[in-house]
A protein has these predicted regions:
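Hydrophobic faces of well-ordered beta-strands that scaffold small-molecule active sites
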Residues: 27-31, 54-58, 74-80, 113-117, ...
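Terminal membrane/secretory targeting segments in land-plant proteins
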Residues: 1-28, 361-372, 464-465
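Substrate-binding and catalytic surfaces of secreted/luminal carbohydrate-active proteins
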Residues: 138-142, 146, 150-155, 163, ...
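Active-site mouth loops of central-metabolism enzymes
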Residues: 24-39, 88-89, 173-177, 376-385
Length: 465
């Protein structure tokens, strides 16, 4: 819409009104399933309703979840698994069969509105799949047409790292390795089919990676008088999310597609994390989600500085804290509910509750400043014994005398316990390999502690922050 600067104000307003008329500003929830202790699909749908969420995105086409969503007014996004993209891109019959199996039995009783082909494919280092993505999207769209299904938009969610440059927003540029061969034909497809550019956008990570230059309140929509003016566009920003979204908008404009609409496929703020993950707490999580929902559901739509008045369909991440998600602790702590169905904090997806209307006070944040000191990596509570044994073997197989101290007769052999030995191995591995990318995760089996577990002559290696 930036190219319409010469259009009279009333005409611009009319164009925005027409382009947004059929797009709902209702906010949804991402329903991930990477947990071994999550409620049933039917219970989960009731929790989604309790949030007043009007959209839900799942990361597959789980039949039990889809059946539980039958006859609700919740708009549903389903997903083609990453591993099927290559085959679907080369076979219309396989695409037709996927739609026949995963869409036709449920539509229209389930309000499937978006069919997403893969998840963050362009972040995957396997670049071979990149070039199959748009062909697979075209085939899925053709399959929907074959089955006379017209109301489902086809797209694919991308991470913000599809951008090579994002600051200032007016300098937004797609990565050179994907811009021409993948993004441009994708935008052509999205423009032609009136679909969306789906983007996963997390101000938390942008802030956490650059705390020295980004004010926390600016990331949480609490900036007050804190603003940023883009020298290239002269647009003024009051929050970090708008900056990130406009970087995408400018990148699309740079490729000749200024009017492809943006859909926030994921955004959110972690309610907890590892000791070294600053700002991941309930207070910040609730503040961000409440504020972003209020912004996105405001009528008339606020949009962004580069796209004022544009509706931005959005889905918050995520429904649950998922205990089997790999990676650092924040990955397992984006939920609005604990796995037992208890709310972590109150949030109203309708946007009707004023920010002062949430009665239960939030716990004061204690980690908005980086932790300074030593940290050890230990086996987490209530984890699978077999999995711990496998992780111990992995840590010890990396060399560098990682596990010498827990060999028979050595200073850390006693007590002769799997969990003791694994905790030593985890700490030793992390201390040695953190600088080269090693983490204290071990597929969710490990946790960080500031308490020194050393005992007697056994000294556990530590990481110093």
């Amino acid at each position: 819409m930036m190219g319409l600067g010469f259009v009279p104000i009333f005409s611009l307003a009319l164009l925005v009104s027409i382009s947004s008329a059929e797009i709902s500003n209702k906010v949804g929830i991402n329903y991930g399933q990477l947990g071994n202790n999550l409620p049933s699909p039917s219970e989960s749908v009731e929790l989604i309703k309790s949030l007043k969420a009007k959209r839900v995105k799942i990361y597959d086409a789980n039949p039990h979840i889809l059946k539980s969503l039958k006859d609700t007014d919740i708009q549903v996004s389903i997903m083609v698994p990453n591993e099927l993209i290559e085959n679907i891109s080369k076979s219309q019959s396989l695409s037709d069969q996927w739609v026949k199996t995963n869409v036709v039995p449920y539509y229209p009783d389930v309000k499937i509105r978006y069919l997403l082909v893969g998840n963050e494919i362009l972040t995957n280092p396997d670049s071979g799949t990149w070039f199959n993505l748009v062909p697979a999207m075209r085939r899925i769209k053709a399959s929907l047409k074959t089955h006379k299904i017209k109301k489902i938009k086809v797209g694919t969610p991308s991470a913000i790292n599809v951008l090579e440059s994002s600051f200032p927003p007016s300098n937004g540029t797609f990565r050179a390795d994907i811009s021409g061969p993948v993004i441009k034909p994708m935008l052509q497809f999205l423009d032609r089919t009136k679909s969306f550019f789906f983007i996963d956008v997390y101000p938390y990570f942008a802030w956490a990676d650059n705390q020295q230059n980004i004010n926390l309140d600016y990331a949480l929509f609490k900036a007050g008088n804190i603003t940023y003016t883009d020298p290239g566009s002269n647009l003024t920003y009051t929050n970090l999310l708008d900056q990130m979204l406009d970087a995408v908008a400018f990148a699309m404009k740079r490729l000749g597609y200024p009017d492809v609409r943006i859909f926030i496929a994921e955004t959110g703020w972690p309610n907890d994390g590892d000791i070294d993950q600053v700002g991941a707490n309930i207070y910040n999580s609730a503040t961000f989600n409440r504020n972003v929902i209020k912004k996105l559901t405001t009528k008339p739509a606020i949009g962004t500085p580069a796209r004022p008045g544009w509706v931005i369909p959005s889905i918050i991440f995520s429904l649950y804290n998922e205990n089997q998600k790999p990676g650092p602790g924040t990955e397992r702590h984006f939920g609005l509910f604990y796995p037992n169905g208890t709310k972590i904090y109150e949030v109203d997806f309708s946007g009707d509750t004023p920010l002062s209307g949430y009665k239960k006070p939030l716990p004061a944040p204690t980690n908005n400043e980086p932790y300074k000191g030593k940290i050890w990596c230990m086996v987490a509570k209530a984890v699978n014994k077999t999995a711990v044994g496998d992780a111990l073997s992995y840590a010890c197989s990396q060399g560098n005398k990682t596990c010498d101290a827990i060999q028979p007769g050595k200073e850390c052999y006693k007590p002769d316990s799997l969990f003791w030995h694994a905790s030593y191995a985890f700490s030793s591995y992390w201390a040695q390999f953190k600088k080269s990318g090693g983490t204290c995760s071990f597929n969710g089996l490990a946790t960080m502690t500031p308490q020194d577990p050393s005992f007697g002559h056994c000294k556990f290696p530590a990481v110093t922050l």
